[in-house]
């Protein structure tokens, strides 16, 4: 970092991720307050209500297919008993800025579930009088990380970095 000089701002740490990386970004921001903003693209839905079966594999994707959260496997068939969900992860990030890019035709995450999570988290942002700090962008598209999506995310992060 010595060569980067003034380009490195340790008080402006932001994270961004696509798909599982988007989920990891949310967890990171929720539990590390040094992270000032997070952007997630196609990164989450509801764990409690993601029991849609064959199309998404439900919570099995976390516990068996890509075992990022293996203990969720204990809740297969009892998803409503999962002790937390992504609206609560988003609420832990509040009032810091969060950008959620969730295409409406995502084959892995049901847009309606993402929308519910964001709306629930919005209530916490409202308590902080920071309702504009959580943004849901929902293009009529599929789960992918196109150059256009990358530009949307990067422009949002740049806007957060230069705001004050």
Q: What does each model-identified segment do?
A:
Residues 1-19, 35:
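Gly/Ser-rich "nucleophile elbow"/oxyanion-hole loop immediately N-terminal to the catalytic nucleophile
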Residues 13, 98, 133-134:
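Short, conserved active-site loop motifs that form the nucleotide-linked donor/cofactor pocket
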Residues 16, 41-42, 101, 139:
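Alpha/beta-hydrolase-fold catalytic nucleophile elbow
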Residues 17-27:
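Glycine-rich nucleophile elbow surrounding the catalytic serine of serine-hydrolase chemistry
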Residues 30-36:
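Conserved hydrolase catalytic core segment
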Residues 40-89, 110, 114-118, 126-131:
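Mobile cap/lid helix-loop segments that gate and shape the active-site cleft of serine hydrolases
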Residues 94-112:
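Conserved strand-to-loop "acid loop" that flanks and positions the catalytic carboxylate
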Residues 118-164:
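C-terminal catalytic histidine-bearing segment of alpha/beta-hydrolase fold enzymes
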């Amino acid at each position: 970092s010595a060569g980067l000089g003034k380009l490195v701002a340790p008080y402006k740490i932001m994270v961004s991720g696509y798909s599982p990386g988007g989920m990891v970004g949310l967890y990171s921001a929720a539990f590390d307050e040094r992270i000032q903003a997070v952007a997630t693209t196609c990164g989450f839905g509801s764990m409690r209500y993601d029991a849609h079966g064959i199309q998404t594999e439900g919570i099995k994707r976390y516990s068996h297919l890509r075992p990022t959260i293996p203990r969720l496997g204990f809740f297969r068939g009892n998803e409503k008993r999962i002790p937390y969900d992504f609206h609560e992860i988003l609420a832990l990030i509040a009032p810091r800025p969060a950008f959620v890019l969730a295409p409406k035709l995502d084959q892995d995450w049901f847009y309606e579930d993402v929308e519910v999570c964001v709306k629930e988290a919005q209530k916490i942002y409202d308590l902080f009088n920071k309702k504009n700090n959580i943004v849901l962008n929902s293009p009529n598209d599929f789960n992918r990380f196109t150059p256009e999506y990358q530009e949307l995310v990067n422009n949002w992060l740049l806007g957060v970095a230069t705001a004050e």
